[in-house]
A protein has these predicted regions:
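Acidic donor-binding segment of Leloir-type glycosyltransferases
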Residues: 1-33
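Acidic donor-diphosphate engagement hotspot in glycosyltransferases and nucleotidyltransferases
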Residues: 15, 44-45, 68-72
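Glycine-rich, basic loop-to-helix element that forms the pyrophosphate-binding segment
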Residues: 36-51
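Conserved donor-nucleotide/metal-binding helix-loop-beta segment in metal-dependent transferases, i.e.
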Residues: 69-87
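Short beta-strand-to-loop element that shapes/binds the nucleotide-sugar donor at the catalytic cleft/hinge
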Residues: 88-101
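A recurrent flexible, glycine/aromatic-enriched loop bordering the glycosyltransferase active site
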Residues: 95, 110-129
Length: 214
């Protein structure tokens, strides 16, 4: 790993600096970006991506638990095997049960089994991707007011890209109950989030139908 870029879109910069100081210099190069004023996720992603000078990007948020090692190396091998893979995801079949996925499992040349995500071909979930593929879309800020991942998926699917994920998962989502903009009660279930996502998609479809969003 050449560089670890962390963006903080809150007032917790000092806490992060103290945390990073425990690891900085131990064969890791950290770049901490603390926004002076809150910019939101999309602008924060753009700021981070402007710092990237490597061929590959591993994108991740802080509410994921990693279950085992080796995911970057294995993901890179699979990206090299098929240039039309936009993202190599790390979630299990069961964790992707709410979206269309392939019935079959496939075997990569490195011996890893994987399945294909049929509709949502681009995601902000943990996963390795090529920088040149990310650059095709450009700034993420233009997604403001839209369904981010739906728009990204449409863009990449129209260009023949796909997303795959490992049968034997590398991550587990631990952030459902601290999703700050969804429930003030902090008691969200997985079903709550699926319903919330569905409602947002329906709302966005109607807004697009009546020309409220482009």
């Amino acid at each position: 790993i050449k560089k670890i870029i962390i963006t903080e879109d809150s007032t917790e910069g000092k806490k992060l600096e103290r945390l990073i100081s425990k690891y900085d210099g131990k064969n890791q190069d950290f770049r901490l970006i603390v926004n002076e004023t809150r910019l939101g996720q999309l602008k924060s992603i753009d700021k981070a991506y402007r710092e990237i000078d490597t061929e590959y990007i591993f994108h991740c948020e802080d509410d994921w638990e990693f279950l085992r090692e080796g995911f970057i190396e294995k993901s890179m091998e699979m990206l090299k095997e098929d240039p039309k893979i936009a993202v190599v995801g790390l979630r299990s079949r069961e964790d992707c049960s709410g979206i269309p996925i392939s019935k079959e499992n496939y075997m990569a040349s490195n011996g890893e089994e994987y399945f294909e995500i049929l509709e949502d071909v681009f995601t902000y979930n943990p996963g390795l991707r090529r920088k040149d593929v990310c650059d095709l879309f450009g700034s993420h800020e233009k997604l403001e007011g839209k369904l981010w991942e739906a728009e990204l998926s449409k863009f990449y699917k129209e260009r023949g890209y796909k997303m795959i994920s490992f049968v034997n998962p590398f991550v587990e989502h631990i952030g459902n109950k601290r999703h700050v903009h969804f429930s003030k009660r902090g008691k969200n279930s997985v079903l709550d989030f699926k319903i919330d996502r569905m409602v947002k998609k329906i709302r966005y479809t109607f807004l697009k139908l009546f020309g409220k969003v482009k």
